[in-house]
Amino acid sequence: EDIARALADVSAPPGRLERVAVPDDGGVSVYVDYAHTPDALAKAIASIDAVGGGRTIVVFGCGGDRDATKRPIMGAKALAADYAVVTSDNPRHEDPGAIIDDIVAGMDDAARFEVVPDRRAAIARAIELARPGDAVLVAGKGHEDYQLVGDEVLAFDDRVVAAEELKRAFGGTETN
């Protein structure tokens, strides 16, 4: 309780355990964090768990053309959350499905995760699964406002997408 009160007065840098706030969030807390290493993901999940009362649902992926050996480790660390939604995160020139397969190889409890390759759909799915009192952690991109796919830089901001999906789920506002 003391920790929760203290953290309520602290503001994190953009994209670091940044709370996504909308007028009607259905009692679901959504946070965006840049956590893109196994240690950072584990710490972000632990931080959410320390202040939350409900379940923690994490949405995450791993970047393409980067250290492939960390992917199964990220998968294993994600299971510190109550549930995980594995998705795409800057696949660059790699096949997003192959990246996801590498991640899932480290996840030994199939009942506690699912794969949703489209990042927007993955964020929407996590919010859909959440109940009042739960927290959703969208990890990996943090402050970034783009998605790298092949040679394309596509506009994509986890914070904006999460706010849109919260509004759609609980506020009746449709998104495109």
Short names for language-model regions:
Residues 1, 5-176:
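ATP-dependent carboxylate-amine ligase
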